[in-house]
A protein has these predicted regions:
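Cysteine-nucleophile amide-bond enzymes
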Residues: 1-267
Length: 267
């Protein structure tokens, strides 16, 4: 059974994107190809709809992103075989247990990572020869959300160049904040280009989805360190949940508004 058409989302556009990678069984390659497609698209601050006192609306936009919705969209496309799969994977990636509620949204990236590791969508990249740092944080930057304790394990900034031996195109990189009340301040997708290590990301400062040298971003930004995750699995159908099947067109909207700065803003 097909979903109701999300307002503003062209099924043909999603189908075209999926057709470009349908014969590639490597999730990393699919992430690489799909993330390239959106270079030059607009950065959209606060792209999600919902708050502590506003009903959550499940949104799916291919027109503009913050750093997190860019990654979520690419991951969902990379795992999907059709439009309904794309919508379902996006729901599972964005919300704890796939439940479309503001309180269940993965507001902080440590939670986002933990829940997506648990469901087998991503896994940590093994880097046995790279030093790791552990920092405890109390996360409290989202209005209306109770403070959460988080333990952040990351590669310290000075050691990031040593990651070159381990990273692959399609890996996800998360930049750990120096603030004691925030875990991650930005995220992107790694691309290997010969000896160069590039990153694709929705850049707030440039107003676009861009590709740049990872070293340039590291030089320009203060951070404690980075975390790296690798997308898992191959494309496959996913059972359509009753929650999404029953959503009206009012509840699924392709939107270009509300939630980015509160929800770990992009650089």
């Amino acid at each position: 059974m097909k979903h109701s058409q999300p307002r503003g989302l062209s099924r043909r556009r999603v189908e075209h994107l999926l057709s470009e990678t349908k014969n590639d069984r490597s999730t990393g390659n699919r992430v690489d190809v799909l993330s390239r497609h959106f270079l030059g698209h607009s950065y959209k601050p606060n792209p999600l709809i919902g708050s502590a006192d506003t009903a959550e609306v499940f949104t799916a936009s291919l027109d503009g992103f913050d750093c997190v919705t860019y990654i979520e969209t690419i991951l969902a496309l990379a795992r999907a075989v059709n439009v309904d799969d794309f919508i379902e994977w996006l729901r599972k990636i964005r919300y704890a247990e796939g439940r479309i509620e503001w309180a269940r949204r993965n507001h902080y990236m440590t939670l986002w990572i933990r829940n997506n590791v648990r469901t087998g969508i991503i896994r940590p990249v093994s880097m046995p020869a790279v030093p790791m740092l552990i920092r405890d944080r109390v996360l409290n930057v989202v209005p209306g959300l109770a403070a959460q304790r988080a333990r952040v394990k990351c590669v310290p900034k000075p050691a990031v160049p040593r990651l070159a031996a381990y990273l692959q195109s399609g890996d996800l990189i998360f930049f750990v904040s120096t603030a004691k009340n925030l875990d991650v301040f930005h995220a992107g997708i790694i691309v290997r280009a010969g000896k160069s290590m590039l990153m694709r990301h929705a850049s707030r400062s440039q107003g676009l989805v861009v590709e740049q040298e990872l070293s340039e971003f590291l030089k320009a930004n203060r951070m404690t360190g980075v975390m790296v995750m690798r997308p898992q699995g191959v494309p496959g159908r996913i059972a359509v949940s009753n929650q999404v099947r029953g959503l009206s067109m009012r509840r699924i909207r392709c939107a270009q508004r509300s939630d980015g700065a509160k929800r770990r803003g992009g650089k």
